[in-house]
């Protein structure tokens, strides 16, 4: 189960345990039920299993849905289905879904649903590594892996759990030759004492290096933030990169960069708070997508409403590349 590419637990009947209640009580002095020790709430939160379902019939439906995106083996391509959703569908919600206030969150899952073929998104691991969203979907009928930041949880930063979740998902896509679509709103590695104790840097770097080792096509859309070392995990080798006007990128978010680089200048100012805001505004202008687009750092700066159309065109362009990816799996199964 734990070594599977996808796993699902029944909420009513399933538990996963290394030792049952009697053994735990005798050895550890803990009085716990099987559900408390290893029920679906425990294991969908800690990442042991991907999804939970109401009963066994619902579990089979989840498995069937997962397999609908998968090829029969690594020697075959994933099945492309007929798509009645217009390639050039441009949803007006995308034009205003990212708030003008950089500190406000938005619904990345809504972005995903508006860009992919309608009702095609199948999320995996929603309860684990919650700052990252991973799942399978379709663009013009072509199965793709979808990875995005969830700014509603820890601002979408890359935590230890999030990095582990992303790494496993990238490896899944690489193994089965699924193109990857990354919707980027990455503020960087999670900071703070707990993040340091959890070795976020090490686990985050593992995700970055896994992305760098892939051979499948990538399309990355800079929706908003793209900062720090963590951002590198969102861009595959020779990937196709699009940017929205709301995109901002750099080594550090403005607030952190100003606080570190201009600490003395701010402290010496007659009005430190005013000076801090002035510096943040100056640097924010440099982190906009326009200088990067002018320097050919992205393939195109687009109206967000064109995202689906551009990604569907990309899917069409990469079709000749996919057969060459078939064969021996590049990654073993790493839980």
Task: Annotate the PLM regions.
Residues 2-335:
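Ligand-binding clefts of soluble mixed alpha/beta catalytic domains
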